[in-house]
Protein backbone atom coordinates (compact mmCIF):
# COMPACT_ATOMS: atom_id res chain seq x y z
CA UNK A 1 0.00 0.00 0.00
CA UNK A 2 1.19 3.49 -0.91
CA UNK A 3 -0.12 6.61 0.83
CA UNK A 4 0.62 10.16 -0.33
CA UNK A 5 0.50 12.95 2.24
CA UNK A 6 0.13 16.39 0.67
CA UNK A 7 0.58 19.28 3.05
CA UNK A 8 2.48 22.12 4.66
CA UNK A 9 4.88 22.32 7.62
CA UNK A 10 2.87 19.97 9.84
CA UNK A 11 3.03 17.29 7.15
CA UNK A 12 6.70 18.06 6.54
CA UNK A 13 7.32 17.27 10.21
CA UNK A 14 7.90 20.69 11.76
CA UNK A 15 8.40 20.53 15.53
CA UNK A 16 8.71 16.76 15.58
CA UNK A 17 12.01 15.93 17.27
CA UNK A 18 13.07 13.77 14.32
CA UNK A 19 11.60 12.81 10.97
CA UNK A 20 10.57 9.37 12.16
CA UNK A 21 8.38 11.07 14.79
CA UNK A 22 6.38 12.93 12.11
CA UNK A 23 2.82 11.64 11.77
CA UNK A 24 3.45 10.68 8.13
CA UNK A 25 6.31 8.35 8.96
CA UNK A 26 4.43 7.04 12.00
CA UNK A 27 1.52 6.00 9.75
CA UNK A 28 3.99 4.09 7.59
CA UNK A 29 5.39 2.35 10.65
CA UNK A 30 1.97 1.46 12.06
CA UNK A 31 0.62 0.08 8.78
CA UNK A 32 3.91 -1.28 7.44
CA UNK A 33 3.27 0.56 4.19
CA UNK A 34 5.00 3.04 1.90
CA UNK A 35 4.33 6.70 2.71
CA UNK A 36 5.37 9.62 0.53
CA UNK A 37 5.73 12.98 2.26
CA UNK A 38 4.78 15.94 0.06
CA UNK A 39 4.87 18.46 2.90
CA UNK A 40 6.38 21.87 2.16
CA UNK A 41 6.57 24.36 5.00
CA UNK A 42 4.63 27.61 4.63
CA UNK A 43 2.64 26.55 1.58
CA UNK A 44 -0.98 27.44 0.94
CA UNK A 45 -3.84 26.05 -1.12
CA UNK A 46 -4.16 29.30 -3.11
CA UNK A 47 -1.62 31.20 -5.18
CA UNK A 48 0.09 34.15 -3.53
CA UNK A 49 -0.22 37.55 -5.24
CA UNK A 50 2.90 39.14 -3.74
CA UNK A 51 5.99 36.91 -3.46
CA UNK A 52 6.82 35.68 0.03
CA UNK A 53 10.18 36.34 1.67
CA UNK A 54 10.79 32.58 1.48
CA UNK A 55 10.23 31.42 -2.14
CA UNK A 56 9.27 27.85 -1.21
CA UNK A 57 6.23 29.22 0.69
CA UNK A 58 4.78 30.11 -2.72
CA UNK A 59 4.84 26.52 -4.01
CA UNK A 60 1.08 26.34 -3.56
CA UNK A 61 -0.86 23.08 -3.46
CA UNK A 62 -2.39 23.68 -6.89
CA UNK A 63 1.07 24.02 -8.43
CA UNK A 64 2.35 20.94 -6.59
CA UNK A 65 -0.49 18.63 -7.62
CA UNK A 66 1.78 17.37 -10.41
CA UNK A 67 4.16 15.93 -7.79
CA UNK A 68 1.66 13.44 -6.40
CA UNK A 69 2.04 9.74 -7.09
CA UNK A 70 -0.82 8.63 -9.33
CA UNK A 71 -0.23 5.04 -8.23
CA UNK A 72 -0.95 5.85 -4.58
CA UNK A 73 -3.72 3.88 -2.92
CA UNK A 74 -4.71 6.84 -0.74
CA UNK A 75 -3.95 10.55 -0.66
CA UNK A 76 -4.42 12.86 2.31
CA UNK A 77 -4.50 16.63 1.79
CA UNK A 78 -3.73 18.63 4.94
CA UNK A 79 -3.62 22.40 4.49
CA UNK A 80 -5.43 25.71 4.61
CA UNK A 81 -3.98 27.07 7.84
CA UNK A 82 -1.35 29.10 5.96
CA UNK A 83 -3.99 30.60 3.66
CA UNK A 84 -5.54 31.97 6.82
CA UNK A 85 -2.22 32.84 8.43
CA UNK A 86 -0.41 34.72 5.69
CA UNK A 87 -2.08 34.13 2.33
CA UNK A 88 -3.02 37.18 0.27
CA UNK A 89 -5.30 35.49 -2.29
CA UNK A 90 -8.86 36.85 -2.17
CA UNK A 91 -11.62 34.55 -0.95
CA UNK A 92 -13.30 34.68 -4.36
CA UNK A 93 -16.63 33.26 -5.46
CA UNK A 94 -18.12 29.80 -4.95
CA UNK A 95 -17.92 28.98 -8.65
CA UNK A 96 -14.22 29.90 -9.04
CA UNK A 97 -11.93 27.14 -10.27
CA UNK A 98 -8.60 28.92 -10.34
CA UNK A 99 -5.63 28.81 -7.95
CA UNK A 100 -5.86 32.61 -7.61
CA UNK A 101 -8.69 32.66 -5.03
CA UNK A 102 -9.29 30.49 -2.00
CA UNK A 103 -12.64 29.17 -3.24
CA UNK A 104 -11.02 28.61 -6.62
CA UNK A 105 -8.03 26.77 -5.19
CA UNK A 106 -10.17 24.34 -3.19
CA UNK A 107 -12.37 23.73 -6.25
CA UNK A 108 -9.25 23.29 -8.39
CA UNK A 109 -7.71 20.81 -5.97
CA UNK A 110 -10.90 18.80 -5.54
CA UNK A 111 -11.78 18.63 -9.23
CA UNK A 112 -8.26 17.71 -10.31
CA UNK A 113 -7.73 15.14 -7.57
CA UNK A 114 -10.87 13.41 -8.84
CA UNK A 115 -9.21 13.15 -12.25
CA UNK A 116 -6.23 11.41 -10.63
CA UNK A 117 -7.90 9.16 -8.04
CA UNK A 118 -11.25 7.65 -7.14
CA UNK A 119 -13.05 9.74 -4.54
CA UNK A 120 -12.78 6.85 -2.06
CA UNK A 121 -8.99 7.25 -2.18
CA UNK A 122 -9.03 10.94 -1.23
CA UNK A 123 -9.41 12.56 2.18
CA UNK A 124 -8.71 16.11 3.31
CA UNK A 125 -7.69 16.90 6.89
CA UNK A 126 -9.16 20.19 8.12
CA UNK A 127 -6.93 22.81 9.79
CA UNK A 128 -6.38 22.27 13.51
CA UNK A 129 -6.91 24.85 16.23
CA UNK A 130 -4.21 27.53 16.39
CA UNK A 131 -3.52 30.58 18.52
CA UNK A 132 -5.23 33.83 17.49
CA UNK A 133 -7.38 32.03 14.92
CA UNK A 134 -10.12 34.66 15.17
CA UNK A 135 -7.94 37.51 13.87
CA UNK A 136 -9.21 38.58 10.41
CA UNK A 137 -5.65 39.69 9.63
CA UNK A 138 -4.34 36.15 10.16
CA UNK A 139 -0.91 36.26 11.74
CA UNK A 140 -1.12 40.05 11.54
CA UNK A 141 0.62 40.74 8.24
CA UNK A 142 -2.37 40.80 5.87
CA UNK A 143 -3.00 44.17 4.25
CA UNK A 144 -6.75 43.56 4.11
CA UNK A 145 -8.94 41.80 6.67
CA UNK A 146 -10.28 38.44 5.58
CA UNK A 147 -11.98 35.48 7.24
CA UNK A 148 -11.16 33.85 10.53
CA UNK A 149 -9.70 30.35 10.42
CA UNK A 150 -13.20 28.97 10.92
CA UNK A 151 -14.30 30.82 7.79
CA UNK A 152 -11.59 29.10 5.76
CA UNK A 153 -12.53 25.74 7.26
CA UNK A 154 -16.17 26.24 6.31
CA UNK A 155 -15.22 26.94 2.69
CA UNK A 156 -13.15 23.75 2.54
CA UNK A 157 -16.08 21.74 3.89
CA UNK A 158 -18.56 23.43 1.55
CA UNK A 159 -16.51 22.68 -1.54
CA UNK A 160 -15.67 19.11 -0.55
CA UNK A 161 -19.33 18.41 0.19
CA UNK A 162 -20.11 19.52 -3.36
CA UNK A 163 -17.64 16.98 -4.74
CA UNK A 164 -18.57 14.28 -2.19
CA UNK A 165 -14.96 14.10 -0.99
CA UNK A 166 -14.31 12.99 2.58
CA UNK A 167 -12.73 15.29 5.11
CA UNK A 168 -11.44 14.53 8.59
CA UNK A 169 -11.71 16.96 11.50
CA UNK A 170 -9.30 16.14 14.31
CA UNK A 171 -9.61 19.47 16.15
CA UNK A 172 -11.48 18.08 19.13
CA UNK A 173 -9.08 15.15 19.51
CA UNK A 174 -5.99 17.38 19.34
CA UNK A 175 -7.66 20.17 21.33
CA UNK A 176 -7.32 23.93 21.60
CA UNK A 177 -3.86 25.31 20.89
CA UNK A 178 -3.40 27.31 24.09
CA UNK A 179 -1.44 25.48 26.81
CA UNK A 180 -1.91 22.21 24.95
CA UNK A 181 0.62 19.46 25.82
CA UNK A 182 0.26 18.15 22.24
CA UNK A 183 1.13 21.48 20.57
CA UNK A 184 4.66 22.88 20.48
CA UNK A 185 4.14 26.53 19.54
CA UNK A 186 0.43 27.28 19.25
CA UNK A 187 0.23 25.70 15.80
CA UNK A 188 2.52 22.71 15.18
CA UNK A 189 2.08 19.40 17.01
CA UNK A 190 4.96 18.05 19.06
CA UNK A 191 5.95 14.37 19.11
CA UNK A 192 2.88 13.42 21.15
CA UNK A 193 0.65 15.42 18.83
CA UNK A 194 2.14 13.77 15.76
CA UNK A 195 1.63 10.37 17.40
CA UNK A 196 -2.06 11.11 17.99
CA UNK A 197 -2.51 12.36 14.42
CA UNK A 198 -0.99 9.15 13.09
CA UNK A 199 -3.23 7.01 15.28
CA UNK A 200 -6.34 8.90 14.14
CA UNK A 201 -5.42 8.47 10.47
CA UNK A 202 -4.73 4.76 10.95
CA UNK A 203 -8.08 4.38 12.72
CA UNK A 204 -9.80 6.06 9.76
CA UNK A 205 -8.05 3.82 7.23
CA UNK A 206 -8.79 0.63 9.12
CA UNK A 207 -12.48 1.54 9.26
CA UNK A 208 -12.79 1.87 5.47
Regions picked out by a protein language model, each given a short descriptive name:
Residues 1-6, 10-36, 63-72, 115-122, ...:
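N-terminal secretory targeting modules
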Residues 2-4, 12-100, 104:
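Conserved SGNH/GDSL esterase-like catalytic core that processes O-acyl groups on lipids
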Residues 9, 81, 128:
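Residue-level signal for short, function-critical loop segments
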Residues 25, 111, 154-157:
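Active-site phosphate/pyrophosphate- and oxyanion-stabilizing loops and adjacent acidic/basic residues
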Residues 37-39, 124, 169:
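Structural signal for conserved beta-strand scaffold positions within catalytic alpha/beta enzyme cores
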Residues 65, 106-110, 153:
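Generic structural signal for well-ordered alpha-helices
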Residues 76-78, 121-125:
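Conserved, well-ordered alpha-helix/loop/beta-strand core segments that scaffold catalytic motifs
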Residues 87, 127-208:
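Catalytic His-Asp segment of secreted/periplasmic serine-dependent ester chemistry enzymes
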Amino acid sequence: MIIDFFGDSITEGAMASSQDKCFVERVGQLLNCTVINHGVSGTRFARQKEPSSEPRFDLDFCYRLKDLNRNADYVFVFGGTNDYGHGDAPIGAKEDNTPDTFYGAVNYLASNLLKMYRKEQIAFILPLYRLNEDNPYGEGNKKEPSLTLEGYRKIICEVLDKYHIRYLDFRNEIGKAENNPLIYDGLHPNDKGHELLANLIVKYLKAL
